[in-house]
């Protein structure tokens, strides 16, 4: 059955009753606006929106459940980069009228599965038809304690640069199945002083310079130390993108303890020092090939 045969109201009737609601949801999906009761003790409200567009972030032949998973996890990876806890999500789906209803159902199943992984309540959204490709926008709201918020703009000269996991070759499978490093980020900010952090969505060659520019510093990188996925080369680690790992800067005074504690807490996930932040006037980093840049 096509979407044009089912119609918006009947489609929403099929989808909305399955969406996960937490105890803090007062009025959820289906109303004009969602109403939530934020938990006490959180200092900052955190908001993020992200999109997934057919032909850019996924191909139509991709498994719809995997596409739904990725669409939800993309903004959650940004929450990991700020050490924030996601709690509510809004979904906007734009699809051609000829889209199979079964595809949409599987897509929403992927959304629900990803949301449940981090106890996120899907509280509403919007649907619309289009003559173009399928596109989805996911907006997420959450919270973070004031003393645990991390941005990309507070890196300091002399900081060590670390990256979680392994880089390169994500397009083969990982980009549809990754899990944001929220648990790892929360552990880091609870136990260590993290000066700056960013998630590697567009590639190390794009995201590392972004962090350095935001912090008004330069960087030097040890290419031989980059942790590579199986079959990936240094160029892949720098340029492929879609890794969704964390890149962060912290004081070298805590590096030994950080690495030792990390291995004990996350023995199956590598943490690698790949370089350091230096004064802008002393930049010695190679000209990194860029990752993915929209509109170019």
Where are these regions (language model features)?
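Extreme N-terminal cap/leader segments of soluble proteins
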Residues: 1-63, 82, 91, 106-115, ...
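Glycine-rich anion-binding loops of enzyme active sites
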Residues: 2, 45, 52, 85-171, ...
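Acidic, Ser/Thr/Pro-rich beta/coil linker or hinge segments at domain junctions
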Residues: 3, 260-296
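General beta-strand structural signal in soluble alpha/beta enzymes
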Residues: 27-28, 46-48, 121-125, 163-164, ...
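Residue-level signal for inorganic ion chemistry
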Residues: 35, 75, 83, 122, ...
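Small-aliphatic-rich amphipathic alpha-helix that forms the alpha element of a beta-alpha
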Residues: 64-88, 109-117, 205-211
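Active-site-proximal betaalpha loop/short-helix elements
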Residues: 98, 176-243
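Helix N-cap motif at beta-to-alpha junctions
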Residues: 249-256
